[in-house]
């Protein structure tokens, strides 16, 4: 999602009060200190924990207290490092730590699913909470998580739909964008009346069935917009391989050329309040897709506050921008093709922070002092 970026509460929140030291210390204790020791071994992992704390602050504290100011992740990180005793010694390095963390996130493997309807004429796309780009539901892998398991989890979080019974591990399309591997499993035959609704907060603004022929690039030179005007930064690179897959795997449900299926919005944050809105996508929606929006930083899509603390990741994903063909490679995997080697293990967490050491004894001392107090 995932890429999709969650948006802060700034559009609705007009508070100007910074979080108190008590609140910051509570968040630090809950999300950074009270975790397994292995998750405190590098700043990459620590920053992922800080990111969880950030989204808890935005989704709960800011929502419940209109006086609190909505912050960017970098602003929150700086405040937390200055407030937390065990993080304060590293404040002078905060810019380098945050820069390396953002770069590291762009190398974490991403998986998701290309969901096709029963006729294979339409695919399901999701749009981020803020911005107008569309993508297939997907997100970053957690530590030691298998590709297919990540895809199932991310699709469930972004759409509320469980693809575990339909996903075939050998059917996927894979690209490598610069240093980031992106694998999307092809999940075909999903019925139109399937109910979709994201489980995450402030991550997805719309879920829609889009016609594949409307997603085709407007020209060979422009792959970021479809013929209908939709922004397709995260979609266009997969369309050619998807078309080839469909030719080899005809749909069991006959198409009706005289009555083509329409694009269909199945969930919209503006019209769905705890429910599921359904509406046909009108031309006016397409016009809105053409509006240029400022690209969000890759640091803004953590994703759902994971119940399992991820060391590798959490939902943005690919950098939004024109994807040039010489920067990508693609693989369509089936029974008779050779599996792609996963180089993600070559990325050693903490490697970019080799000069920094997280002092575990200081953490334990701080916890003991807190308990005795």
From Swiss-Prot:
Region (Disordered) residue spans: 275-342
Motif PDZ-binding: positions: 370-373
Catalytic activity: a 5'-end (N(7)-methyl 5'-triphosphoguanosine)-ribonucleoside in mRNA + H2O = N(7)-methyl-GDP + a 5'-end phospho-ribonucleoside in mRNA + 2 H(+)
Result when mutating residue 248 to A: Reduced mRNA decaping activity
Keyword Transmembrane: no
Top-level taxon of the source organism: Eukaryota
E.C. code: 3.6.1.62
Residues involved in Mg(2+) binding: 154, 158
Compositionally biased tracts (Polar residues): 324-334
Tissue: Expressed in seedlings, mostly in root tips, root hairs, and the vascular system. Also present in roots, leaves, stems, and flowers.
Disruption-associated phenotype: Lethal phenotype at the seedling cotyledon stage that are small and chlorotic, with disorganized veins, swollen root hairs, and altered epidermal cell morphology. Altered RNA decay.
Impact noted for substituting residue 243 to A: Reduced mRNA decaping activity
Residues binding ATP: 178, 233
Molecular-function GO terms, alphabetical: 5'-(N(7)-methylguanosine 5'-triphospho)-[mRNA] hydrolase activity; ATP binding; magnesium ion binding; manganese ion binding; mRNA binding; protein homodimerization activity
Gene3D superfamilies xref list: Dcp2, box A domain (1.10.10.1050), Nucleoside Triphosphate Pyrophosphohydrolase (3.90.79.10)
Residue ranges of every copy of the Nudix hydrolase domain listed in the record: 106-234
Keywords on record: ATP-binding, Cytoplasm, Hydrolase, Magnesium, Manganese, Metal-binding, mRNA processing, Nucleotide-binding, RNA-binding
Annotated compartments: Cytoplasm, P-body
Matches recorded under SUPFAM superfamilies: Dcp2 domain-like (SSF140586), Nudix (SSF55811)
BP term (GO), one: deadenylation-dependent decapping of nuclear-transcribed mRNA
Regulation: Inhibited by the product 7-methyl GDP.
Function text: Catalytic component of the decapping complex necessary for the degradation of mRNAs, both in normal mRNA turnover and in nonsense-mediated mRNA decay. Removes the 7-methyl guanine cap structure from mRNA molecules, yielding a 5'-phosphorylated mRNA fragment and 7m-GDP. Essential for postembryonic development, especially during the formation of the shoot apical meristem (SAM).
Family of this protein: Belongs to the Nudix hydrolase family. DCP2 subfamily.
Protein's recorded name: mRNA-decapping enzyme subunit 2
Organism for this UniProt entry: Arabidopsis thaliana (Mouse-ear cress)
Gene designation: DCP2
């Amino acid at each position: 999602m995932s890429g999709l970026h969650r948006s802060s509460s700034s559009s609705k929140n007009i508070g100007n009060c910074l979080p108190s030291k008590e609140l910051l210390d509570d968040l630090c204790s809950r999300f950074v200190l009270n975790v397994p020791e292995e998750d405190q071994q590098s700043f990459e992992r620590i920053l992922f924990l800080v990111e969880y704390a950030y989204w808890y602050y935005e989704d709960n504290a800011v929502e419940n207290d209109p006086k609190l100011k909505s912050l960017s992740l970098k602003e929150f990180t700086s405040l937390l490092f200055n407030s937390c005793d065990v993080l304060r010694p590293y404040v002078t390095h905060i810019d380098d730590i945050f820069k390396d963390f953002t770069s590291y996130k762009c190398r974490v493997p991403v998986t998701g699913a290309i969901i096709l309807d029963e006729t294979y004429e339409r695919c399901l796309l999701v749009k981020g909470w803020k911005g107008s780009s569309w993508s297939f539901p997907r997100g970053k892998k957690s530590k030691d998580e298998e590709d297919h398991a990540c895809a199932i989890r991310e699709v469930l979080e972004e759409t509320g739909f469980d693809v575990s019974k339909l996903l075939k591990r050998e059917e996927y399309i894979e690209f490598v964008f610069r240093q980031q591997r992106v694998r999307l499993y092809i999940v075909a035959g999903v019925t139109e009346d399937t109910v979709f609704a994201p489980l995450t907060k402030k991550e997805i603004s719309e879920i829609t069935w889009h016609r594949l022929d409307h997603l085709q690039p407007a020209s060979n030179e422009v792959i970021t917009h479809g013929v209908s005007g939709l922004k397709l930064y995260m979609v266009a690179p997969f369309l050619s391989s998807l078309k080839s897959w469909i030719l080899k795997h005809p749909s069991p449900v006959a198409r009706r050329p005289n009555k083509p299926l329409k694009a269909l919005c199945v969930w919209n944050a503006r019209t769905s309040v705890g429910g599921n809105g359904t509406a046909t996508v009108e031309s006016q929606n397409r016009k809105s897709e053409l509006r240029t929006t400022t690209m969000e930083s890759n640091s803004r899509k953590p994703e759902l506050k994971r119940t399992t603390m991820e060391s590798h990741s959490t939902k943005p994903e690919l950098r939004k921008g024109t994807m040039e063909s010489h920067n990508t490679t693609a693989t369509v995997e089936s029974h008779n093709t050779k599996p792609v080697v996963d180089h993600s293990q070559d990325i050693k967490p903490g490697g970019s922070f080799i000069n920094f050491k997280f002092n575990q004894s200081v953490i334990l001392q701080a916890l003991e002092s807190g308990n005795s107090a």
